[in-house]
């Protein structure tokens, strides 16, 4: 998810006009309340985009967290200007002394997850000068990217705007995940949520090239019943994955992952036995197993959040790409290599291993927030989420079947087109999916990687109560 999406690019004159307006309004407030302290609050963002629908929502969340602080200072007046193209501005007039309010604002800035994205300007009528952070005993503001002095980095131009936007998006994603609470659930509740992910995915229709109740897609060796049999056969494995995480002691999480991997090897045999040798859920055995184990580990002592679960996943799978796909660890015989290994050699695409190392960011940062925002019935919400995922990943299953990594760009185009015509909410969008399904069947294409990511998304959505 890009939090700057939908924002208007400003020119220099618009920025300067807003700065002049703010200074003038601050002076008016100081003249009206000569003994009070004036604090202006706005987003502190680099570049020409200062607001967007998503940034507006984030700003309001921060203000909700900041409001109790100002209430403790006794609010005399509050003025909000939230719909400006230069970004929302809020002014608080409070009692108290300038030094104290400034210290409180800096403390909030440094303690809040998004405090660094705020511009908190504190002043009063009788102050001789603005108080600096250093005069109040605080270190200079640090750069978001490298941790060095922020003023130095700005002056020297040490970082690109793209790097700045990327870091801010990362901060906002982490903040959203910290707010998504996963309660402590029973083993059966977590396992049932995982099974729901697999069963909802195969029940969803129409899905380009994938198996659903009315079509085998591009898979001649499987039906919806094959997937149901496979899902049920994996239930004991999901229970074992939960027990591994729930009972594991200590912080050597790669060892916990090793235990899970051994269980996964046994689970694959159970899957093949149930499907007469057909690979229905090999990807889910890997990724869903990791997620179930991580949830069980993170909730051993009580509730947790998605940010913590993502950290557990990354710690479990640290150096996985290097360990599995490094030059000295790859199988030399091409016949013995997996599709993922061959694609890493040919295209340098790390696939699901790379996603796991990063804590499944496509699911955590894109798919789950997107699903939570969707309206309509369950089928519509999940179809839209599937196509959102498909347009934002390098689907190794799709690449394998296409024989060329350029298929990813085609998939991006198809995803954009789908949403431009209204997505699953419109007859045109559904017709587009059906036509795409027929084209995929004809070309023997299937987006199995997107399907696996949807399973994970459904699983987490059930846990956080969004589905």
From Swiss-Prot:
A GO molecular-function descriptor: ATP binding
Gene3D superfamilies reported for this sequence: Triphosphoribosyl-dephospho-CoA protein
Domain of life: Bacteria
EC primary class: transferase
The reaction(s) this protein catalyses: apo-[citrate lyase ACP] + 2'-(5''-triphospho-alpha-D-ribosyl)-3'-dephospho-CoA = holo-[citrate lyase ACP] + diphosphate; 3'-dephospho-CoA + ATP = 2'-(5''-triphospho-alpha-D-ribosyl)-3'-dephospho-CoA + adenine
InterPro entries to which the protein is assigned, alphabetical: CitG (IPR002736), CitX (IPR005551), TriPribosyl-deP-CoA_syn_CitG (IPR017551)
Keyword vocabulary terms for this entry: ATP-binding, Multifunctional enzyme, Nucleotide-binding, Nucleotidyltransferase, Transferase
Enzyme Commission no: 2.7.7.61, 2.4.2.52
Residues spanning the signal sequence: none
Region ranges (2-(5''-triphosphoribosyl)-3'-dephosphocoenzyme-A synthase): 179-467
A biological process from GO: prosthetic group biosynthetic process
Chain residue ranges for the region called Apo-citrate lyase phosphoribosyl-dephospho-CoA transferase: 1-178
Keyword Transferase assigned: yes
Stated family: In the N-terminal section; belongs to the CitX family. In the C-terminal section; belongs to the CitG/MdcB family.
PANTHER family, per database record: 2-(5''-TRIPHOSPHORIBOSYL)-3'-DEPHOSPHOCOENZYME-A SYNTHASE, TRIPHOSPHORIBOSYL-DEPHOSPHO-COA SYNTHASE
Function in brief: Bifunctional enzyme that catalyzes formation of 2-(5''-triphosphoribosyl)-3'-dephosphocoenzyme-A, and then the transfer of this prosthetic group precursor to the apo-acyl carrier protein (gamma chain) of the citrate lyase to yield the holo-acyl carrier protein.
Name of the protein this chain belongs to: Protein CitXG
Recorded name of the encoding gene: citXG
């Amino acid at each position: 998810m890009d939090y700057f999406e939908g924002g208007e690019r400003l020119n220099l004159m618009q920025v300067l006009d807003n700065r002049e307006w703010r200074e003038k309004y601050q002076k008016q407030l100081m003249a009206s309340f000569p003994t009070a302290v004036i604090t202006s609050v706005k987003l502190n963002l680099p570049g020409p985009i200062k607001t967007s629908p998503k940034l507006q929502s984030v700003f309001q969340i921060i203000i909700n967290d900041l409001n109790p602080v100002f209430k403790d200072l006794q609010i005399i007046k509050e003025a909000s200007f939230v719909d400006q193209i230069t970004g929302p501005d809020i002014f608080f007039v409070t009692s108290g002394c300038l030094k104290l309010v400034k210290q409180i604002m800096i403390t909030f800035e440094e303690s809040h997850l998004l405090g660094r994205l705020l511009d908190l300007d504190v002043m009063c009528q009788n102050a001789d000068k603005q108080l600096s952070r250093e005069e109040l005993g605080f270190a200079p503001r640090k750069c978001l990217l490298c941790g060095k002095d922020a003023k130095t980095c700005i002056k020297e131009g040490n970082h690109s705007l793209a790097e700045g936007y990327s870091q801010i998006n990362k901060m906002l994603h982490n903040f959203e995940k910290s707010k998504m609470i996963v309660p402590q659930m029973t083993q059966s509740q977590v396992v049932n949520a995982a099974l729901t992910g697999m069963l909802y995915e195969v029940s969803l229709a129409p899905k380009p090239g994938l198996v659903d109740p009315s079509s085998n897609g591009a898979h001649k060796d499987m039906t919806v019943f094959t997937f149901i049999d496979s899902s049920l056969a994996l239930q004991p494995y999901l229970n074992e994955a939960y027990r591994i995480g729930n009972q594991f002691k200590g912080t050597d999480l790669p060892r916990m992952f090793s235990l899970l991997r051994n269980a996964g090897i046994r689970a694959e045999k159970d899957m093949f036995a149930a499907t007469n040798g057909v690979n229905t859920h090999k990807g889910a055995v890997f990724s869903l197993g990791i997620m179930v184990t991580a949830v069980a580990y993170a909730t051993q002592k009580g509730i947790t959040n998605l940010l913590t679960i993502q950290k557990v996943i990354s710690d479990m799978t640290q150096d996985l790409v290097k360990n599995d796909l490094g030059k000295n660890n790859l199988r030399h015989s091409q016949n013995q290599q997996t599709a993922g290994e061959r694609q890493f050699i040919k295209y340098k695409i790390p696939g699901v291993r790379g996603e796991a190392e990063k804590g499944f960011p496509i699911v955590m940062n894109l798919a789950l927030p997107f699903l939570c925002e969707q309206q309509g019935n369950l089928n519509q919400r999940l179809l839209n989420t599937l196509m959102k995922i498909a347009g934002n990943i390098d689907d190794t299953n799709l690449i394998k079947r296409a024989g060329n990594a350029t298929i990813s760009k085609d998939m991006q185009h198809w995803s954009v087109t789908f949403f431009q015509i209204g997505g699953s909410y419109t007859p045109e969008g559904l017709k587009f999916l059906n036509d795409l399904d027929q084209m995929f069947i004809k070309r023997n294409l299937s987006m199995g990687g997107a399907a696996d990511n949807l399973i994970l998304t459904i699983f987490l959505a059930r846990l956080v109560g969004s589905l």
